[in-house]
C-alpha cells in the first residue's frame, strides 16, 4: 500500500505514520529524516542539501524530489510506503506521480488529518519550542493551507479525511478505517 499523509503542522502525521508503518509493515518515509540521514551519511545529495540548510535557505524541490526518488528505489519500499511531509506542493505531487509511474504503480490512498486551528495552536504551543510563537504558528498554518489546497483537489479521487482530534489510538483507528484496514 502506497499512502500519502497530509495535514498541518501539529496534526499528528508523524506519530500516525509511525503507527501505520508498524501495523502495515511498510516504511515511513519522512523528508526530514531523509535530509538528516543523507547529511549524516555524507551522500552527495545530503551534502548538497546541507549547504542550503546551513545557509538558512529552503532545499530546492528538485533536490528533495531526488532524495525521495532514491528512497523509493530501496527494496523495503517496493511493496509500499507511507509518505510523511511529501509532497508539499502541486509540483512535488506531479513529480511523485512520475516517480511512481516509472515503477508501474501509483498512490493507493491519501489521508488528510484534519484539526481545527484552535486545537493546532494549543498542540503546537504545548510542544514548548522557543520558535513556536502564535505569529510563527499562524504563518506556518497559512503556508500549509496555501500550498496544500491544490493537493486536496489533485488527490480528490484517493483522498480520505481523518478527524485527528482524540487519543492517539482513536485517531489511529480512524486512519486504519479510512484505509479499509
UniProtKB/Swiss-Prot annotation:
Subunit description: Monomer.
One GO MF term attached to the UniProt entry: ATP binding
Top-rank taxon: Bacteria
Comment, domains: Consists of three domains, a large central CORE domain and two small peripheral domains, NMPbind and LID, which undergo movements during catalysis. The LID domain closes over the site of phosphoryl transfer upon ATP binding. Assembling and dissambling the active center during each catalytic cycle provides an effective means to prevent ATP hydrolysis.
Lineage of origin: Bacteria, Bacillati, Actinomycetota, Actinomycetes, Mycobacteriales
Enzyme Commission number(s) of this protein: 2.7.4.3
Gene3D superfamilies named in the record: P-loop containing nucleotide triphosphate hydrolases
Binding site for AMP: 31, 36, 57-59, 85-88, 92, 129, 140
Residues that, per the record, bind ATP: 10-15, 127, 166
Name used for this protein in its record: Adenylate kinase
Region described as NMP: 30-59
Similarity comment: Belongs to the adenylate kinase family.
Protein function: Catalyzes the reversible transfer of the terminal phosphate group between ATP and AMP. Plays an important role in cellular energy homeostasis and in adenine nucleotide metabolism.
InterPro entries: Adenylat/UMP-CMP_kin, Adenylat_kinase_CS, P-loop_NTPase
Pathway(s) served: Purine metabolism; AMP biosynthesis via salvage pathway; AMP from ADP: step 1/1
